[in-house]
């Protein structure tokens, strides 16, 4: 069972209860999260699930705030804590041309990941796409309310990002 959509940690009571029930039934659980939550909750959830999928959107805290609505210090601190716990996790990085796929951000992200304690995590690049745009239109909701210029990264940009990570000793795959 994968818990995702919005931020599952914002529904902590239900999430904890469901993780406990799944564990009793030997059902594998994954929590897809930004880790923007109280460290005590993160520690508890990490100890109850089988895998964490953790997004890193931007290393610059001000730009992270601009694009994701929150600063990233708590997120990065929680990632470091989870890494130190030895909990299985995968770092996922959405690649968005004009937002976070630039060389500096990629180098900063790779450097951060390579500095984490414990075993080097798997890293997945998720190239931006606008598949959800049609769904938002059908539902009458706004897809990109802040009109952030978002573009799918070119193969050249994707390959450059992979090389930057590789040069930092971090293997990243493209999903």
Language-model features: where?
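A structural motif corresponding to the C-terminal lobe/cap of the Radical SAM core domain
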Residues: 111, 117, 121, 136-164
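Radical SAM enzyme core and accessory elements
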Residues: 167-175
